[in-house]
Structure formats: structure tokens, C-alpha cells
Amino acid sequence: VTPMLAADVVILDGGLEQGIRLGMVCRVTRGLQSVGELIIIESRSGQSAGLILELVKDSTIQAGDIARIKTIQNS
């Protein structure tokens, strides 16, 4: 995850080639700790952009955080 200047959008290092599609919801974690959730608003071959939907209290999404597609199993 790479933060942008816009407060509510982050850039992900994965995109269409990694199966990330428009509208997917991702959970963002740092280590074992949940940081928040985002929804994919744009996806290109190797990058995508996500709009932050929710942040855990007093948390921010930082470079190096891991975004995983939220599925029924890991929700």
C-alpha cells in the first residue's frame, strides 16, 4: 500500500494481473493488526487505487501495509 496526498485514497502495488477488480473490498492489515477497509475504485495491470471505507480508531494506512481481498472466509 502506498498512501497518496488525498486523505482517503491509497495506491496498491497489485492490479488486474493480480486479480484485483473494480468494486472489490479489501481488508488492510499491519502485521496481525487490522487497520481498516477500502474499496477498489480503479484497477490497471500492475496497480490499483482504493477508497478508504473504514479505519480502526487512531489508525492510518501506511506504506507497507497489506491489503487482502475481503471474502466470506476472511471477513
Can you say where each PLM-predicted feature lies in the sequence?
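Surface-exposed, polar/charged interaction patches used for macromolecular assembly or partner binding
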Residues: 1-75
